[in-house]
Swiss-Prot record:
Name of the featured protein: Phosphoenolpyruvate carboxylase
Gene Ontology molecular function terms on file: magnesium ion binding; phosphoenolpyruvate carboxylase activity
Function: Catalyzes the irreversible beta-carboxylation of phosphoenolpyruvate (PEP) to form oxaloacetate (OAA), a four-carbon dicarboxylic acid source for the tricarboxylic acid cycle.
Lyase listed as a keyword: yes
Organism annotation: Saccharolobus islandicus (strain M.14.25 / Kamchatka #1) (Sulfolobus islandicus)
Cofactor: Mg(2+)
Family classification: Belongs to the PEPCase type 2 family.
Subunit structure: Homotetramer.
Listed NCBIfam families: PEPCase_arch
Length: 511
């Protein structure tokens, strides 16, 4: 049996600080190849996700890794000891990138030939897994698996002319199959994930399956509590399915450093391991790696790699029904407020520092992402924008919990263990001065501000959260938030950008 990675380094552009080895503030090109090597060698991460979604991708990454760092990769076999996993564009959603999907798939046999030359015959398959983002049905991942088998691996049997086959020209094509990891990002698909996985299992018959649960984008689209509870429902469903099919499922969770995006940081990783029992692989995003002291980062990654994997909490039907109800109530409260703040979020997001060379995709669940009826920036910029205007998104929609009775509240608390801790971490950065300033700058309605105030009041009076400045960092962040809004109002954008960067350094994450 192969090693199942515990940690997966990603290229999420959420870092405030720029790593010393980067040639510029925007990490791209050769720097991303170097970053992949450093993730393995310096940080001890088991797996690197190589992202072809929403950006120009270098499909020669394996060639560059093996030729630039031969000593390391002779000792650590790519595909056996450490892993490289492609994140594809979803051809059904991202129409402009359909051919990038094809190009990335076509590059997999090239990596096989390179590894054969480097390691010897039959030693390893360096790239054998792909991640399909925005998966909503089993048909999508079945199609990806079959596309590779039929359109890539089997093309070596095509006859060109007069008995001459493709393989006579370019050699045989390996591997013959790939493993597809669905990345599930929307609420309904997370809560019905068993249908996606079971349908794939019945057709493809894999020996095991890795399933990627998003935590960041569902928070942006439906609110933090909806995202957490949807992941809990998904983990329960996956473990039930694993038992009923007698088939191993290894969940991955996509988590960032701030509470809204998952709260996995070198300072909070133990709480996240406790929160998401049953998860095998945790994403190590850029803020985790570059916004904290290196020794602390390396130690945290080592601890995650060596931590025990506890079983997921299996939900009874009545518990699951309560959690589903909460996600609907919460989203109904959260989305209209976000729609009202969309202009503010979009205006601020374009001023945040850029950390990756990413192309912008437009449209529902593309990039930009959408919540309800409005287009929004990517999740990192979304979160960074709301923190910067002094309204952490963790607080938005929270008063919807007032609709729960005592039994429902108990079920909620049992299934979101670190709820109060996550909320308190975010609430330190709340700025009371924001209301007047955002009303003035973006003409935010009294109704929207009244709703946010209800959420704030509920967090304080019912949950017992302390809002605003409780230490030097939070006080400084609040001051910077007011200065940012004032400079933005006066259109002194160079100063606005400076304050945004300073706040990101305090949070140890752009968003």
């Amino acid at each position: 049996m192969r090693i199942i990675p515990r940690t997966m380094s990603t290229q999420h552009p959420d870092n405030a600080k720029v790593p010393e080895w980067a040639k510029s503030e925007v990490i791209e090109g050769e720097d991303e190849v170097k970053e992949a090597f450093l993730a393995y060698s310096m940080y001890g991460v088991h797996e690197v996700m190589w992202d072809a979604e929403g950006k120009d991708v270098d499909t020669h990454v394996v060639r560059k890794l093996l030729s630039n760092y031969p000593d390391y990769f002779r000792e650590h076999i790519l595909g056996k000891d450490v892993f490289l996993t492609y994140r594809l564009p979803n051809p059904k959603v991202e129409g402009a990138d359909r051919k990038v999907f094809a190009e990335t798939m076509e590059s997999i046999p090239i990596t096989y030939d390179l590894a054969e030359k480097f390691y010897g015959n039959g030693i390893t398959v360096p790239v054998f897994e792909v991640i399909l983002p925005m998966t909503t049905s089993n048909l999508e991942i079945i199609s990806v698996a079959r596309y590779y088998e039929k359109a890539v691996a089997n093309e070596d049997e095509l006859e060109l002319y007069n008995g001459v086959k493709v393989k006579d020209l370019v050699g045989e094509i390996y591997p013959k199959v790939i493993e597809v990891i669905p990345l599930v990002e929307d609420r309904d698909s997370l809560q019905n994930i068993d249908n996606i996985v079971e349908g794939y299992y019945k057709v493809i018959k894999p020996k095991y399956m890795r399933v990627f649960l998003a935590r960041s984008d569902p928070a942006m689209n439906y609110g933090m509590i909806t995202a957490v509870l949807s992941v809990k429902i998904a983990l329960s469903e996956l473990y039930k399915l694993s038992e009923s099919l007698n088939f191993e499922i290894y969940p991955i969770i996509g988590v960032g450093s701030l509470p809204f995006r998952g709260h996995l940081s070198p300072e909070n990783y133990e709480k996240v391991l406790e929160e998401y029992k049953g998860v095998y692989t945790y994403t190590i995003q850029s803020a985790f790696k570059y916004d904290y002291d290196y020794d602390k980062v390396k130690s945290a990654i080592s601890s995650i790699n060596n931590s025990r994997i506890g079983p997921a909490k299996i939900l009874e039907k009545y518990e699951e029904d309560v959690l589903r109800k909460i996600t609907i109530l919460y989203t109904e409260r959260y989305q209209p407020i976000i729609e009202s703040l969309a202009n503010a979020i979009n205006d601020v997001s374009v001023l945040l520092p850029r950390r990756r060379a990413r192309k912008l995709h437009i449209g529902l669940f593309g990039y930009s992402r959408s919540a309800g009826k409005v287009s929004l920036p990517r999740a990192i910029s979304f979160v960074g924008s709301l923190y910067s205007i002094g309204i952490p998104p963790e607080l938005i929609g929270i008063s919807s919990l007032s609709n729960l009775d005592e039994k429902e509240w108990d079920i909620f608390k049992q299934n979101y263990v670190n709820f109060k801790h996550d909320l308190q971490t975010a609430a330190r950065f709340f700025n009371w001065e924001s209301f007047e300033l955002i009303k003035d700058i973006w003409k935010i309605s009294e109704d929207t501000i009244a709703k946010i105030k209800e959420d704030i009041d509920y967090a304080e009076s019912v949950i017992g959260i302390k809002l605003g400045d409780i230490d030097y960092d939070s006080r400084k962040h609040i001051l910077m938030s007011s200065l940012f809004l004032l400079s933005f109002k006066e259109k002194i954008l160079q100063e606005s950008k400076k304050y945004l960067y300073e706040m990101a350094l305090i949070r140890r994450s752009l968003g």
